[in-house]
């Protein structure tokens, strides 16, 4: 009650000030104005929405004398935190038009927003402008530019900027190095990231856990697991404790390469160091085991994570269900699906797609269609492609054609894969003429036949001993620059 009363008073005072205090340069009211805006920011702003922030900004622009740049910066900062970067840039420009000068803080806010919008040329011009007004870029300025360049995959521009700033006496800190190293790793420039790591060491900047995590993940993604393991040992020697992200990155690459004993040793080491494996760690282990057909061990890993108090998520179950279905053990996959529901987890489209495909591959089209009819999540084009292909492969082509006809009438956007499946199904039952009609209609539907379309149709003509048509189509495929499968 007291808080709402304060806000109400502030609101009424605000209206009063805008009506009565628009005259410029009244020395009597300057202290009162400063106290008023200070009180407004301290009592009201935490509950203000975007529209109210804009309204406040407009009132501040109209007030005389003007509030301080600090107060304007608070509004810009709040709007920037809501990710309305273009709006901040517009308001910043409006302040300049109104003759309101900026300080380093407000410049940094707009530079960050420009970088978030990938408007790097303008961001650099703002840096030049602020330097003309006597404001030297600080670590926040440079960090914003570096982060923007890295997010825009312009890592070399980020490195060049650091070099130029060093010439001006700026010393990059661990945050800036981490940003560039992480950006380099994410676009596959792992060697450059390692060179930068060595450079920061030479410059006396101590790497932290974030540095190592980025490098370890980058090395793992590029298949350099031995270098990643060496880096982890280096971490331990420097008393930088690897965290769950570090361990998980290396475990993930070990299991993908089939090095399960090494992965389990690392798992045991992380528990020994009191680093609790999280759902991502277990998901990596389960995924790796499933990739190599070791689904029973993957299921044991699920049981282990539950006993350790780590709750599986939809990804965990989707991975396991997919593993069992690929191993032609679809009933066990369905059992996991039911267990998933008992844990309060709702299967997504991927879950249903996996089970439907599993039943089709097991030669049980009726069970697949039953799962589809009970599907809770919205089917996607992948779902329908699985249905069409499964029906065709199980000699239910007529049902597939009915489904295809319904799909054409619906708002589902069909792709070339969908048409290829239907063309294949028609050819499978000897209905080559209808398949040919569908093939020829592709261009009218805005689709271009791919190598699968051509080879399926050529194969259909060959089965009907229509050699001239198959030969002409083969030549057309070559003219389109497609090589046969």
Swiss-Prot record:
Any one of the GO CC terms: mitochondrion
InterPro entries documented for this protein: Mito_RNA_Proc_CCM1, Pentatricopeptide_rpt, TPR-like_helical_dom_sf
PPR repeat residue numbers: 68-102, 103-137, 138-172, 173-207, 208-242, 243-277, 278-312, 313-347, 348-378, 380-414, 415-449, 450-484
Family from the record: Belongs to the PPR family. P subfamily.
GO annotation (BP), single: seed germination
Protein name per its UniProtKB record: Pentatricopeptide repeat-containing protein At1g62720
Keywords: Repeat
Pfam families: PPR_1, PPR_2
Keyword Thylakoid carried by entry: no
Cell membrane as UniProt keyword: no
UniProt cross-references to SUPFAM superfamilies, sorted A to Z: HCP-like
UniProt cross-references to Gene3D superfamilies, sorted A to Z: Tetratricopeptide repeat domain (1.25.40.10)
């Amino acid at each position: 009650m007291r808080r709402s009363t304060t806000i109400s008073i502030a609101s009424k005072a605000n209206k009063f000030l805008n009506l009565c205090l628009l005259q410029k340069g009244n020395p009597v009211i300057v202290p009162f104005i400063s106290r008023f805006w200070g009180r407004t920011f301290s009592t009201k702003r935490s509950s203000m929405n975007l529209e109210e922030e804009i309204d406040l900004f407009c009132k501040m622009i109209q007030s005389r004398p003007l509030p301080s740049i600090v107060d304007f910066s608070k509004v810009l900062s709040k709007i920037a935190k809501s990710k309305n970067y273009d709006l901040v840039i517009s308001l910043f420009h409006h302040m300049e038009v109104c003759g309101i000068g900026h300080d380093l803080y407000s410049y940094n806010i707009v530079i960050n927003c420009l970088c978030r919008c990938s408007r790097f040329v303008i961001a650099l011009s703002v840096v030049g402008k602020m330097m003309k007004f006597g404001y030297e870029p600080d670590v926040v300025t440079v960090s914003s530019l570096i982060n923007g360049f890295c997010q825009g995959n312009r890592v070399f521009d980020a490195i060049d900027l650091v070099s130029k700033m060093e010439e001006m006496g700026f010393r990059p800190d661990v945050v800036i190095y981490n940003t560039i190293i992480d950006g380099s790793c994410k676009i596959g420039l792992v060697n450059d990231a390692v060179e930068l790591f060595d450079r920061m060491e030479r410059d006396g900047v101590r790497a932290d856990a974030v540095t190592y995590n980025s490098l370890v993940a980058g090395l793992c993604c590029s298949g350099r697991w031995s270098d990643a393991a060496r880096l982890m040992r280096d971490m331990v020697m420097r008393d930088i404790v690897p965290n769950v992200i570090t361990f998980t990155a290396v475990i993930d690459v070990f299991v993908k390469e089939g090095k399960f004993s090494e992965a389990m040793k690392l798992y045991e080491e992380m528990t020994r160091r009191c680093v609790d494996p999280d759902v991502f760690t277990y998901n990596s282990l389960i995924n790796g085991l499933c990739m190599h057909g070791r689904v029973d061990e993957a299921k044991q890993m699920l049981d282990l994570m539950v006993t350790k108090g780590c709750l599986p998520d939809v990804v965990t179950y989707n991975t396991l269900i997919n593993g069992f279905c690929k191993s032609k053990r679809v009933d066990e996959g369905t059992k996991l699906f039911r267990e998933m529901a008992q844990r309060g987890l709702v299967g997504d489209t991927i879950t249903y797609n996996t089970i439907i495909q599993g039943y089709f591959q097991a030669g049980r089209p009726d069970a697949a269609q039953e799962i589809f009819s009970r599907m809770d999540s919205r089917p996607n084009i992948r779902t329908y492609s699985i249905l069409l292909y499964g029906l065709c492969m199980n000699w239910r082509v007529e049902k597939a054609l009915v489904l295809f006809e319904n799909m054409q009438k619906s708002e589902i956007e069909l792709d070339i894969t969908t048409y290829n499946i239907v063309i294949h199904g028609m050819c499978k039952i000897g209905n080559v003429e209808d398949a040919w009609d569908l093939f020829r209609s592709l261009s009218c539907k805005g689709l271009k036949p791919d190598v699968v379309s051509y080879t399926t149709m050529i194969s259909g003509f060959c089965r009907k001993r229509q050699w001239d048509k198959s030969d002409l189509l083969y030549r057309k495929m070559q003219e389109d620059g497609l090589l046969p499968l």
